[in-house]
Amino acid sequence: MATINQLVRKSRSSKVVKSNVPALEACPQKRGVCTRVYTTTPKKPNSALRKVCRVRLTNGFEVSSYIGGEGHNLQEHSVILIRGGRVKDLPGVRYHTVRGALDCSGVKDRKQGRSKYGVKKPKA
């Protein structure tokens, strides 16, 4: 425990909290342009072809973003919106593509959990 005199000379330093999503710069989402759309394999023990795209953001950052849902219409030069949220089994992928915003379409024939995949309520 520090004495009062020690605290007067040098106050306590607060912990620096490091962001998990530095490219967003404290914004909820950021717009960017796809520079490459590709599939990659997850780390052990999972096995799949995960859809990922490399995105050049409006602030100059270049990041990898995961494309969730079944099927997508993204290609090079598509303008997309990204949000934070990492993919646990893909190293280096710390962002998600927002479905149903800008050039990224919603998931086709999606009935449940629609809001996460940019799908409007189907006509009854």
Curated annotation (Swiss-Prot):
- Modified sites of kind 3-methylthioaspartic acid: 89
Print the keywords alphabetically: Methylation, Ribonucleoprotein, Ribosomal protein, RNA-binding, rRNA-binding, tRNA-binding
Which GO molecular function, any one, fits this protein according to its record? structural constituent of ribosome
CDD domains reported for this sequence: Ribosomal_S12 (cd03368)
Record's GO cellular component terms: small ribosomal subunit
**Which residues form each disulfide bond in the chain?**
none
Gene3D superfamilies (alphabetical)? Nucleic acid-binding proteins
Instruction: Read off the Pfam families from this record.
Output: Ribosom_S12_S23
Q: Name one GO biological process term.
A: translation
Recorded hits in InterPro entries, A to Z, give: NA-bd_OB-fold, Ribosomal_uS12, Ribosomal_uS12_bac
Record-stated family: Belongs to the universal ribosomal protein uS12 family.
Free-text function comment from the UniProt entry: With S4 and S5 plays an important role in translational accuracy.
This protein's assembly is summarised as:
Part of the 30S ribosomal subunit. Contacts proteins S8 and S17. May interact with IF1 in the 30S initiation complex.
Q: What is this protein called?
A: Small ribosomal subunit protein uS12
**Which species expresses this protein natively?**
Proteus mirabilis (strain HI4320)
